[in-house]
Each structure stands twice: as structure tokens, then as C-alpha cells.
Design a protein with these regions (language model features):
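Bacterial N-terminal signal peptides that target proteins for export
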Residues: 1-7
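Sec/Tat signal peptide C-region and signal peptidase I cleavage site
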Residues: 17-21
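A cross-kingdom marker for long, charged
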Residues: 22-87, 91-350
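Bacterial N-terminal signal peptides
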Residues: 7-16
Length: 350
């Protein structure tokens, strides 16, 4: 039901339509497309439980309660966006609040994993404007800028690789779940390459998870968006925390001293991931190191609009002693690394 869904999702921590026929796909891309579709189908075939440790879901972590922070600006922006859509557009965009579309997202490009909904690429100017107004109402200024910069990396990828089937700054799709309301659950999803936002609203509570913020290259040294960069604050905050640990703490935090593979585990199709804690526990950190840890978390949570971000940070802070920080790789200024932050109420991977 809707109440259980809220609790579960919180645990996880314009021109014309551009359509490409199967004949336009290279054979290797078609094979990848098939593999991703099959993986998504398998995941959606399993009942949703949520991310948990091997001890199971902890009940009662996320009560439905008033935060005292109005969601009216988000709701009104969503209404304005929906009002710009035609009947045909609405049939593609609108889903029931409990539709599996919530789970049917991916961080890979649209050439490999087709999306539902309507893309920025297909919208007219009025629709684009209202879509961006919705994002501006839902996100902080920093979150909005990061969203825009991630989309710009797609232009850089196109300049490097070509392949208009796969890459483009407007190949990002909007869907709406439920009907914007002051008291009933609703939300929206933005889904595309390296950028996924699932945004759930109930009364004055907001949950923005699961979310994926990524991109390549992280810095564009040429092209239309030369100088564009992404995820530097998240990178620097994590490294600063690791470098603040003493030798014994670093040993406790380090899962593997060598970064030789993709260590991400909570990607698409991992709604029911069983993941036990690793690394150093928050209770083993000094007061300053705990503040550093919260600063890393804030670099992600801060993409959410304020004061909703502060509400989320307060929830996270209540579990800081039970929050684990783990590291893969070395910790010099120029090292390649991965880190994870994992607590009863949030899971972050970088």
C-alpha cells in the first residue's frame, strides 16, 4: 500500500519525436539492449522489498509525519507542467502511484535502455520551460545546476563518439506517478543517461531516492561545453574525510587498497539488494570527523530543495553513530577511489 511504499522507498537510501528503428541499431548495441531489458524484466518480476542488510528491513524508521515544510511550490509546478501536455502526451507521462515504472529506471543511455514518458527532446518550448520549472521547485540551486551539467556531458559524449541514437542533452524522460495533491501520495521521475531522479511527495514529506548522479567525462576540456565539470564537491568531500582519518581508522575504513574494477552495487535493478555494513563505524570517529562525514552526505542530500534537505539531514544525523564509511583504493590527492556511506536510513556510493 502507499504507506508501506513510502517506508520502503526511504530505506533505499522539442521538436518532433525522435524514434530509431531496430535496423538503425548496430548488432552489438542491440545485444546490449536485449541484455538490459531482460535484466529489468527479471528485477520487476520480484516483489519490491527495499535495500536491507542480512538482518532484514528495520520497521518504524520512516514514520509518516508532518515536517512543517510546505510542498505547495512543487505541487503547483507539477500542475503547470501537466497542463502543458496534450491528451496523447498525458497518456505517456501519467502512471498510477504504485506503478512499477518507479523501479524501471537505468543509468545507461537510451540507446541501450529505452525509457517511457516524454523526453525534453520531444517537448515544445512551453513544455520544456514548465519541466525545468518543476525541477527548479523540487531541487536546490546546486541540484539544478548539477542536473544541467550532467546533461551537458551528453553533448561532450556525442562530440567524442557520435551515435545520436545514444547521446544528447535532451534525452531525459519525465513521468508522473499519481496526481499532484496536498494529502495523497504522488511523485515524478526524471530518467536518462547518468541522471535519474525519483521524487516522492506525501503531504509535506519529500523523498528523493533512489537517485543517480553521474557522467563522463567529469571535466570537458574541449567542445561546446568546454570547462563543464560535475561531481567535484562529492569527490573532494569524500577524499577530505578519508584523509582526516588516522592510520588505524584508515585500515578500518579500507575494504580494498586497490581500485581495479567498478565497485558499485546499488545500481538499477537492485531494489531488493542485501548489503551488509563495511568499513569504519561513525561511533569510532572523532567529533570533527563526524562533521566531515555529515559534510560528505550533505554534498549529495543538498541536491534536494531546502528546507527539505535539512529535514533529511536531521534524520540521517540521528543515526550518525551507526553510519559506516568504507573506501576502496588509495587516498592521495590524485588517487582513483570508491567510497560508500551506509546507515539504516541512507546508502551513498561514489
Amino acid at each position: 500500500n502507499n504507506i508501506n511504499y513510502l517506508a520502503a522507498i526511504l530505506v533505499i537510501s522539442f521538436a518532433g519525436n525522435v524514434v530509431f528503428s531496430q535496423s538503425q541499431y548496430p548488432s552489438n548495441l542491440l545485444a546490449q539492449k536485449g541484455n538490459f531489458s531482460a535484466g529489468a524484466a527479471r528485477a520487476l518480476g520480484q516483489p519490491f522489498q527495499g535495500v536491507a542488510t542480512s538482518d532484514g528491513i528495520i520497521p518504524g524508521l520512516f514514520p509518516i509525519k508532518s515536517t512543517g515544510v510546505s510542498t505547495a511550490p512543487i505541487r503547483e509546478a507539477a500542475d503547470r507542467f501537466l497542463a502543458t501536455l496534450s491528451t496523447a502526451d498525458l497518456s505517456r507521462v501519467h502512471f498510477a502511484i504504485n506503478d512499477p515504472e518507479w523501479r524501471d529506471w537505468s543509468n545507461v543511455d537510451v540507446g541501450i535502455f529505452p525509457r517511457r514518458g516524454i523526453s525534453l527532446e520531444e517537448m515544445n518550448e512551453a513544455q520544456k520551460d514548465s519541466a525545468w520549472e518543476l525541477l527548479a521547485a523540487a531541487l536546490s540551486a546546486e541540484g539544478l545546476e548539477q542536473t544541467q551539467n550532467i546533461m551537458k556531458t551528453e553533448q561532450t559524449l556525442f562530440e567524442i563518439n557520435g551515435e545520436p541514437i545514444r547521446y544528447g542533452t535532451e534525452k531525459y524522460y519525465f513521468t508522473m506517478m499519481g496526481i499532484p495533491s496536498s494529502d495523497s501520495p504522488w511523485g515524478f521521475q526524471l530518467d536518462g543517461h547518468h541522471l535519474v531522479i525519483n521524487y516522492f511527495v506525501l503531504g509535506d514529506q519529500v523523498v528523493m531516492t533512489p537517485a543517480f548522479w553521474g557522467g563522463e567525462p567529469v571535466y570537458a576540456d574541449s567542445g561546446m561545453y568546454e570547462g563543464n565539470h560535475i561531481l567535484q564537491n562529492e569527490q573532494d568531500a569524500g577524499l577530505q574525510l578519508m584523509q582526516s582519518l588516522d592510520a588505524a581508522q584508515k585500515r578500518a575504513a579500507t575494504v580494498d587498497p586497490e581500485k581495479v574494477r567498478n565497485n558499485q552495487v546499488a545500481a538499477a535493478n537492485q531494489d531488493n539488494l542485501i548489503l551488509d555494513y563495511e568499513g569504519i563505524k561513525g561511533a569510532e570517529l572523532t567529533s570533527q570527523q563526524k562533521l566531515n562525514l555529515l559534510n560528505v552526505i550533505r554534498s549529495f542530500v543538498g541536491a534536494l530543495r531546502n528546507p527539505h534537505a535539512e529535514v533529511t539531514m536531521d534524520e540521517i544525523g540521528q543515526h550518525i553513530d551507526d553510519t559506516y564509511f568504507s573506501w576502496v583504493g588509495e587516498s592521495a590527492d590524485d588517487s582513483v577511489f570508491y567510497y560508500r556511506i551506509h546507515s539504516p536510513v541512507i546508502l551513498i556510493e561514489f
